[in-house]
Amino acid sequence: MDRGSLLPFQLWCPRPFSKYSQNQPRPPSATLKPPVCPDTSSGTEPDHRPAHLESTPPALAAEAPTSQHAPLLSTAASGDEGRVLLDTWYVIKPGNTKEKVAFFVAHQCGGGSRASSMKVKGHWGSDSSKAKRRRRCLEPTKAPPDQGGQEGTPATEVAPTSSGDDVDLLSVAEMVALVEQRAALALQSYPRPSTPAPVVFVSAEQGGPAKGLGSERRSGGGDCSRVAEAVAHFEAQRDSPPTKGLRKEERPGPGPGEVRIAFRISNVREPQSPDGSLANGGGGRPACPYPGSPGPGTRAKDKITCDLYQLISPSRDALPSNVEFLLARADEASEGETPAPARPEDTPPAPPPPPARDCGASGFHVDVVVTGVVDACIFFGKDGTKNVKEETVCLTVSPEEPPPPGQLFFLQSRGPEGPPEPPPADTASKVPGPEDSEGTTDTSLCRLYRHVSHDFLEIRFKIQRLLEPRQYMLLLPEHVLVKIFSFLPTRALAALKCTCHHFKGIIEAFGVRATDSRWSRDPLYRDDPCKQCRKRYEKGDVSLCRWHPKPYHHDLPYGRSYWMCCRRADRETPGCRLGLHDNNWVLPCNGVGGGRAGREEGR
C-alpha cells in the first residue's frame, strides 16, 4: 500500500487521545532489557508488545485485521517502504513546546532483508502524528514480560539461550554477574555450562520452597522481584537441585588472596533441624579462628555481625572466589531445613532452595557475597593463620593508680559499664560442638557484637573523654572561683558569663571586676549614669555601653573634667563594642564633650 492510497484527512488528523499516551512511563517489567530490533525475515509479525508502552502503535492497529494500519505495519516492518529501524531511547525535557529529544541509537541486529538504519521518511498512517525518529521496530520473537501470573516456568524459557545475540542485551547487573561467572569458571577450571548466560532467580511464591533453582523461575510482583531479577545465581548451572537434609560437596579450592564479605540478616523464626545439622552444604568449619562461624551442630541463628566478623578476621586457607547473590525469605515450614545458612569459609555451600518470600512482617534473608583481593594482614594485623586468639590492644594497670595521659582509650574498663571480659583462648579457637552449640553460639554472638561495634564506640567515647575539658571548676567553692575570676580580663569574663549560668551568677553576685575594666569606681558615676543610654554600672557588668559623651563636668584638683562614657580614641575599637568601658574623668582637651559642657555652663 503506497502513501497515495491513504485518505487525505489521515495525513493531518492526529490519533485519538483515548488510544495511548506518548509520555507514559515504562512498566516495571520492561526495565530489565530494552527492546531490540528482531530479525524480521518473514512478512507476518505477531505483535506481542503491551499496548500501553510509549513507543507502540495503537492497539487497534495490531488487533483489528480490517483496519487500515495493519497492512502498513506489516509492510513497513518487512522493509519494503523504508521503516525507521533505529532502536532509540528518547528523553523528553519538560517545559519545551517542541519537546527536545535526545536520541541514543542502540545495537542494530543484522538481517538479510532488513532495510538500512538511515534516516528515512516514515508513514503517516502507521503511527499517525508520532515523531518518526522516535519509533521502535516491532518485536515478533520477544515474548511479553511475565507479570507474575504463571508459576513454575522453566528457566530456559525466560533466560537467554544464545550467547551471540543476548549477551549484550542483558542488564548491567546480569552482565557483571556473567563476567564474574566466567572469571570464576576460568580460575577454578570448571567446564563451561551449556547456558553461558546466568539464570535469573526470583522467589515470590507464597508456599513451600522451590524444587530447584536451575529448573524453575518464579516471578511475582514488581516490588518483590525487581531486586532479585537484577542479579544472577550462577552456581545453579552446575549444581543439581538440593535435597532436604545435610548436603556437603567438595569443590575445588578457591584462589589465594581473596576475602569473602558476607552480610547476613537471618529470620528469627527459622526452624531448627531435628538432627541439629545445617542444610545445603552448611557444614561447620574445622579449627575456625573466630567463634562466630557456625559449627556442624549449630543452626543458622547467626545475626548480621557474624558474617561481618568473618570480614574483619579472614583466613588464608578458606577464601572463596565465587560471586553469589541470594535474596529469599527464611523458610517457615517445619521441614527440618534452614535456607541459606551461614557460609563456612572453606567450602562454598550448594545453592539453597528458594523458599517462599513474604514481603510482610515475617522478615527476609539477604546473603550478599562479594570477592576482592585483600590482604589478610590488614585486619587487626593478623597473619591469617589458624588458631589465632581474638585480642584487642589493652594495657593492664592497677585500678589504684591514675591512668597515664594519652593512653586512656587503651585501658580495659573495670567498672560495670565496661565491656565484658573476653572468653579464654580455647573458647575462641575451638569449634563449638553439637552438645554446647546453643550456649557457645549465644556467647560468641554477644562477643562478636562487642568486638565489631562496641569496641569502636568505647574507644571513641574514651577519646572524647580524654580530649574534653575537665569540669573541675564546678566543684570548687565560690570564694576560690571569685579569686580566679578577678585575674581574668573582660573578654574572658564575658565568655564565662555566656557559657555557664553558674559562673554568670557568681560574677554578678560577687561583683567580679576584670583586670582591664574601665568602669569608673567613683560613686558619682553610679549616681549620675549616662544620660543617653541610662546605663549604670552594676556588679559584673560586661554589657555594651557605646561612646555617649556626657556634658556634665566635675572640678578636680588638676582642673575641670567632663564625664565621658568612653574615651574618644577607643570608640571604634572592638573592645568598646564588646563592653570594655572607659568611664574616667578626662580633661576637656581629650574629650568631645568640652564644647557641649561650655554651652551648658553659659545657660
Swiss-Prot record:
Keywords: Phosphoprotein, Ubl conjugation, Ubl conjugation pathway
Post-translational modification: Phosphorylated by ATM in response to DNA damage, promoting ubiquitination and degradation by the SCF(FBXO31) complex. ATM-phosphorylated FBXO46 is ubiquitinated and degradaded by the SCF(FBXO31) complex in response to DNA damage.
GO cellular component terms, semicolon-separated: SCF ubiquitin ligase complex
InterPro entries reported for this sequence: F-box-like_dom_sf, F-box_dom, FBXO34/46
Single GO MF descriptor: ubiquitin-like ligase-substrate adaptor activity
Modified residue annotations for Phosphothreonine: T347
Pathway the protein contributes to: Protein modification; protein ubiquitination
Segments forming a coiled coil: none
Residues recorded as bearing Phosphoserine in the entry: S21, S67
PROSITE patterns: FBOX
UniProt biased composition (Pro residues): 347-356
F-box domain mapped to chain residues: 470-522
Single GO BP term: SCF-dependent proteasomal ubiquitin-dependent protein catabolic process
Lineage top rank: taxon: Eukaryota
Disordered as annotated region, ranges: 20-54, 111-163, 235-301, 332-359, 396-442
Assembly information from the UniProt record: Part of a SCF (SKP1-cullin-F-box) protein ligase complex SCF(FBXO46) composed of CUL1, SKP1, RBX1 and FBXO46.
The name this protein goes by in its record: F-box only protein 46
Organism: Rattus norvegicus
